Each structure stands twice: as structure tokens, then as C-alpha cells.
């Protein structure tokens, strides 16, 4: 089936099968949402559906929930979380066209359009109405995506919108290889090919039902539209019943669905409690998330604080300096673009969605604050054989053109408005921003809510667990008590006894500030080589080039050699033109900062593990994985460290991830990536292989 045919099928199926009034007639009442919202005792209500299409169900739910909140302002439920899956996502232009016919949803559809991502696989989190509504949009085959959705023992979904009749429509003319259909009988007179397709679609539906059951909470409701096709409907109903749903057929809305379809409704009874993560990668929420302390004053602290505050959490931010963003987040300009390769490994699967979320986050922040930034694009030069090979490998990943694409020499010159004599790749959605201004703007926004207390010049130097709370002691002996603590102080994480074994390290980086000139002032994009050069910051009339890289150094003093090397790398990488040689560094204007990095280029985000207990508990993990117990952790103690040089692209999603985990909300990344971000991952990898652990293994 061609992409064009699939796209038209999605558009037609959503336009012709159902309307906003039908959604209100079928999906919402059959799940009893209005009455359930009134009696709901949790802060966030989670709906999941099996096909996003044009977003009609999502938009209708947004409108209905908002109207409910307006009519019931004292209700406990404050937020709506919507999880949806789509194997064949529409382009943004097609989505806009499809939703134009529903002007009543304009408030929500315009926000959806603004942040709707390109067709990159995995989860894309979109936040609407300042966090009151959250959409997790999973692109890819639903049978691959659903097992990647994290859940705890209790489940995460409160209501399911499912349409099994669309499974077969989406899979027309697609063959399922290696599938056994011997146990399924479909009574029809169709051709052998048609029967095979129907059997494959049914097997896919059964796989989906298993995932639905794993993700559903106790008392979670479901509506399921199925085909009237032989005994297929009975197989699906039986499977839902065996999965824990008490199912009945609804005859109240026969005029709202096709006569060839059937509507089943039900709810979960006696759920079998089961998480879907390995015990050594467990992510535990806080036992009390009402009061959280964050140690640190950079962009990771600011994004995490704002994500928590959106969830109604009171946050105290302990900053060792007199002002936030005086450390690694204090630079004038930083590039924002994703770290991609052609392997579809955890780096790509994290940094792709993280970059899209960072753009969304920055654009939303800019609506309420002023900070220097420019989505001017990022150009990465193929300046030598190694960089060319790396770029070619990355391009083999077949990413959407709107994310990254190749430029020849002439196109590179036109795009950058500067001569380099190299081909390149271009990230059209990338750009630069001022990390210091952004961080301070975010903290100001958080303070304006009344939920953030900023304690400047308070250098927390030790933590102690006392009476199920954390006691924080600063450098002058003052003590503070909080229920939950987040360590987000960059390379200084190792000063805390509980976190010192996390295998991250410090990296000194010095950025040079250079005055603009006639050539540099024309630069239109961030230019990356074995270093980077930013376009002019119109506020300072300067550019940034850098940065040096000195591992295991926390020295902040100006270094003449590193200053010279910043220019020399520019000259070395772009040798055949004059303008790099004319860059003026004579004023010795620069800034040094210390980043916190990891060997695998991924941060450490989540529960902090008890290192010695982990070694003892998992000493035989290679041979006893089936009986392994949950990883030992420090209760209510978390980290967000090791962001390296990609903090601007990753911090917003990491802050959202950590806030989601602490508050027990659905997580915005697939299992595989969550495991790759776990603070204990490197220790567990060695233990699984039967290797011993040493210091910072």
C-alpha cells in the first residue's frame, strides 16, 4: 500500500466514519467519563486510544475535559493525559487541512499544529494549556510501540478508546511474516489472501489487547469497536474478558456506527498487578511529591522545577551561587540541534524526540518571557573524511527532510551565507539560544506561580535520610528538611555520598567571544565543524566559538592556549578561505564552564541506586535474572546529571521525564531509552555480563 493511499485511508476513515458529535455519543459516555471525573481521586486522568488519525478523539476529549473543569473547579482531577498511537501519521499540512472542518476545536487544534512533530518513531510529548492537557503521540507500528510504554504495578490508563475495525483497514495489502494462524478460524468465503490478511489483523488485535490489559488500571474502562465478521468478534470479546475486562455489547448507539460494526464496552475487574520493566531498571515515584528540593541552579534544575510546578508541586531550589545559571548554563549562546546517527540506537531515539520537545518548550517559554534565541538552523560541515563518513552514516537513517537533510557545497554556501567549500547536513529546525537568559527566565516564571522558593548562595554539601525525609546541610551548617530531593548540580553531584558512584565525569569547556565583522555578520546559521561558530548575538554584537574539552578538570580560570585553540580549530577545519584567519580573538574575551558528561553520551536521570546494596543483591545477576528483585534505591532521592554539551536539547524533556516519574504520571520515552538513562545502567550492564564492579564502573 503506498504512503499516499495510506494517508487517504486515514483521512477518509476519520472523516466519514465519525464526527465530533459521534465521539461525544460513543467514546465519552461509554467510558462514563463525566461521572468518573466527578468522583476521581487522582490529579491526572489518563485516556489511551489505538489510532490517532486526524486527532478527532483527542480534540473532543480536550474540549469535554476543559468544559468539565470549568463547571467543576473544585474537582480533584486537574489534568488530562491522552496517549495515542499512529502507524501512518499525517503530515502537519494534512493535519491542519483535516481539522479545519472543526472550528469548535480551534483553541486545541492550533496548539497541536504548532508542536506536531515530523514522522520520527517513538513517543512525542505535546503539552497544551500550560500543562493542563498532555498528549503522548506514539509514531510507529502499534504492536511495537505499546510494549514500549512504561507502566508500574498499578497500571497507568484510566480509559481506553479502541477501534479494532481500523486495524484491518490500516493493514490492507500488508503481509505479516512468520505469523501462526492455525488456532484462529474465520468463517467467511473470502479468498485465501483475504483470509490471511484478516487472520493477521486479528492476531495483531490480540497482541494489542494484551498490551491494553498491562497498561490499564483497576476499574479502567474500555469501549471497543469491532467488525461483525464470522467468529472474529467473539474471539476479541473472549480475549478482552480473559485479559481482565468485564465486557458487554452496547446497543444504545447503533445509529452512530456502521451496521457492519459492533460496540463492546467494559471495565477492568481484579487486575493482575504487573509492571512491564526489568526489576533492575525500575522507576519508582515519590511517596510524597508535594514538597521537592532541587539542588542546582542551571537549565536542568529550571526545566525540572517548572515541570513539577505544572503538576502542583511546591519546589525549593538551592543555588550555590548568588544568581542562577552561573555555572555550565551561563554561556551567551548555545546550539540546539539533535544528536543523530543512522543506527536508530538509544542516542537517536532519545535526542530526536528530546529536540522536538525542546523546541516546543522554548517556544512556550518565549510566550511569557524574553530571552535571546533564534531558530536559524544548524549546518554541520563534512570538513574531513571522518566527519563525512559520520554524516553519511547518519543520513542512512532516512530521517524526515524537515529534521535533517544534505546540502552540496553551493547549497551550503547559500544556506549559511558564508564560504566554507564543504558540503554539509542542515538541521532546519535547529538554532541557538542564550542558556543563561533562558534559565533565569524559567526560574522567574516558576517564581511567579508562587510555588518556587529560590534560595541563592546556599551551597548544600550533604544529605541525610531521617524519619522518611531528607535533611539537607549547607556549607555553613544550616539544615533544611524536605520529602523529596533531586540532585541537579552538574559535575558537583559526586560531593554527595549517595551519588558519588554514578559514573559521570567533569569536562571543562572554554568558549571564546569574538567581535563581529563584515563576513561574520552575514552568517545565517550555526556552523558546526570540529567546534562551532554561532551567528551574531545582536544584543552583544559578538559571536561564540568553541569549545575546548578538558576531561576531569573543574578549573574556571582563563586559558590562553584554549582560547588560541578555539580559533585554530576553525582555521584548521576551514583552511581554504580567508575569513577564519581574520577572526579576532585579541581581546581575550571568553568564558569557562564545567559540564558533567558520561561515557555513552546519555545522562543519568531517575532514582539514585544504593551502590553497595546493588552490588550485593545483583552479584549473581547473570545467572538469576528471572528471580531478581527490584533495584535497591534511596527512597525519594533522584538525579538529573550528565547532560554534557547537549543540555539545551535534552534538559526540557529530561525535566519533564523526572517530574512525570516523581508524580507517578505516564513517562514520555520508550522502555529501551528509559533503561539507557537509568542511573544504575552501567553497573547493571557489567553485572549482567558477570563482571565485577569497581569505582565508577
From Swiss-Prot:
<keyword id="KW-0949">S-adenosyl-L-methionine</keyword>
<dbReference type="GO" id="GO:0005737">
    <property type="term" value="C:cytoplasm"/>
</dbReference>
<dbReference type="InterPro" id="IPR008471">
    <property type="entry name" value="MnmC-like_methylTransf"/>
</dbReference>
<keyword id="KW-0963">Cytoplasm</keyword>
<keyword id="KW-0808">Transferase</keyword>
<dbReference type="GO" id="GO:0050660">
    <property type="term" value="F:flavin adenine dinucleotide binding"/>
</dbReference>
<keyword id="KW-0511">Multifunctional enzyme</keyword>
<comment type="function">
    <text>Catalyzes the last two steps in the biosynthesis of 5-methylaminomethyl-2-thiouridine (mnm(5)s(2)U) at the wobble position (U34) in tRNA. Catalyzes the FAD-dependent demodification of cmnm(5)s(2)U34 to nm(5)s(2)U34, followed by the transfer of a methyl group from S-adenosyl-L-methionine to nm(5)s(2)U34, to form mnm(5)s(2)U34.</text>
</comment>
<keyword id="KW-0285">Flavoprotein</keyword>
<comment type="similarity">
    <text>In the C-terminal section; belongs to the DAO family.</text>
</comment>
<dbReference type="Pfam" id="PF01266">
    <property type="entry name" value="DAO"/>
</dbReference>
<feature type="region of interest" description="FAD-dependent cmnm(5)s(2)U34 oxidoreductase">
    <location>
        <begin position="295"/>
        <end position="697"/>
    </location>
</feature>
<dbReference type="InterPro" id="IPR017610">
    <property type="entry name" value="tRNA_S-uridine_synth_MnmC_C"/>
</dbReference>
<keyword id="KW-0819">tRNA processing</keyword>
<keyword id="KW-0274">FAD</keyword>
<dbReference type="InterPro" id="IPR023032">
    <property type="entry name" value="tRNA_MAMT_biosynth_bifunc_MnmC"/>
</dbReference>
<dbReference type="Pfam" id="PF05430">
    <property type="entry name" value="Methyltransf_30"/>
</dbReference>
<keyword id="KW-0560">Oxidoreductase</keyword>
<dbReference type="InterPro" id="IPR006076">
    <property type="entry name" value="FAD-dep_OxRdtase"/>
</dbReference>
<protein>
    <recommendedName>
        <fullName>tRNA 5-methylaminomethyl-2-thiouridine biosynthesis bifunctional protein MnmC</fullName>
        <ecNumber>2.1.1.61</ecNumber>
        <ecNumber>1.5.-.-</ecNumber>
    </recommendedName>
</protein>
<keyword id="KW-0489">Methyltransferase</keyword>
<dbReference type="InterPro" id="IPR036188">
    <property type="entry name" value="FAD/NAD-bd_sf"/>
</dbReference>
<dbReference type="GO" id="GO:0004808">
    <property type="term" value="F:tRNA (5-methylaminomethyl-2-thiouridylate)(34)-methyltransferase activity"/>
</dbReference>
<comment type="similarity">
    <text>In the N-terminal section; belongs to the methyltransferase superfamily. tRNA (mnm(5)s(2)U34)-methyltransferase family.</text>
</comment>
<dbReference type="GO" id="GO:0002098">
    <property type="term" value="P:tRNA wobble uridine modification"/>
</dbReference>
<dbReference type="GO" id="GO:0032259">
    <property type="term" value="P:methylation"/>
</dbReference>
<feature type="region of interest" description="tRNA (mnm(5)s(2)U34)-methyltransferase">
    <location>
        <begin position="1"/>
        <end position="269"/>
    </location>
</feature>
<dbReference type="GO" id="GO:0016645">
    <property type="term" value="F:oxidoreductase activity, acting on the CH-NH group of donors"/>
</dbReference>
<dbReference type="InterPro" id="IPR029063">
    <property type="entry name" value="SAM-dependent_MTases_sf"/>
</dbReference>
